[in-house]
């Protein structure tokens, strides 16, 4: 059976992920993502109103024209998790393919939200929920399997396409967390089984984000302990404390809510994405928030919440807000500009439970946001976070578990892939033979 890989997006940058695997006449697409940095450089861009061709020209979503080079039918579109760099282009591209969108339950709920907010295209693909550990047939001879992984969002999976020639494992995105906060540990046992079943692993497509960092990525439990230590250290402060983190990071938001209660403050979730992600997780029973937890996304309701905080005393509340990357219209940035009823005063504490996404736009916007906050006298507590991506030792462990015949590095530009290439070469792989360094828009024929 012919096996061909199309590297459509995410092979020259961190963002707009999209990969297609052809096994005979059957094709599975993994991810359809957005490159947020290409959107953020433009003022007041509303992607939901834009045409896909304009977004492709901007470099914001994958250019999927290479799909015309693949001879076969798309059987499934499979987002690995709910981050926008993996699902943000589904509302723009999925309607081109007569195939269901298959994902974990939380991911599919987020995809549904993306589709409902789309104003340019009608997306009528079936939405199919499949739990980690589940399988579905792809054509007559292949099978799709979901393996549970841990990442900085709940319900992340690594999909595996089992073919007669061996398994193709799509390894984006994960960290090797054996002590997570809300979920089960990563299913390394299943990865080891896949590496030793049948024909083994034909190809492993891997996220290289942190491949150049030594050691292993700490557990979310480590970030939780750090966060508790910081909040406990400021528990006696009688002014404002504000926290910000990734809205999609339900485990971190849950910890912030819990620790706010422990230091005698009422947590409030503020911002559209904060309300969307946490509200979805709560409705699905994936997180247990206090019954009285307020979530406010619309501008007027947010302002009413801030007025209540100011009237009843900032010392009684912990607003948990959007804006950890310094996004211009996010809540924390607006607070820094003085555009909300919340007054930041000298000595108030701002807790960033997030790292800066390593893109120039994000770095610049985060710097500007911090400077605005400091100008008002705020004290910044930074980088209370652990990454959602494997470091060097995690990559060694995955290679040992899967023992793949071929490797394709992804989720970086060529410079960012170099550390992974060096790591792979130390394990006996060779560029041009079984280590495939590639770019967007290419195809790789693994089996002819």
UniProtKB/Swiss-Prot annotation:
GO molecular function terms attached to this record: 5'-3' RNA exonuclease activity; RNA binding; zinc ion binding
Coiled coil: none
GO cellular component, as recorded: cytoplasm
Cofactor(s), by name: Zn(2+)
EC number annotated for this UniProt entry: 3.1.-.-
InterPro entries: Metallo-B-lactamas, RibonucZ/Hydroxyglut_hydro, RNase_J, RNase_J_2, RNase_J_arc, RNase_J_b_CASP
One GO biological process term: RNA catabolic process
Pfam families membership: Lactamase_B (PF00753), RNase_J_b_CASP (PF22505)
SMART domains: Lactamase_B (SM00849)
Keywords carried by this UniProt record: Cytoplasm, Exonuclease, Hydrolase, Metal-binding, Nuclease, RNA-binding, Zinc
Chain residues that bind substrate: 385-389
Family: Belongs to the metallo-beta-lactamase superfamily. RNA-metabolizing metallo-beta-lactamase-like family. Archaeal RNase J subfamily.
Protein name: Ribonuclease J
Gene: rnj
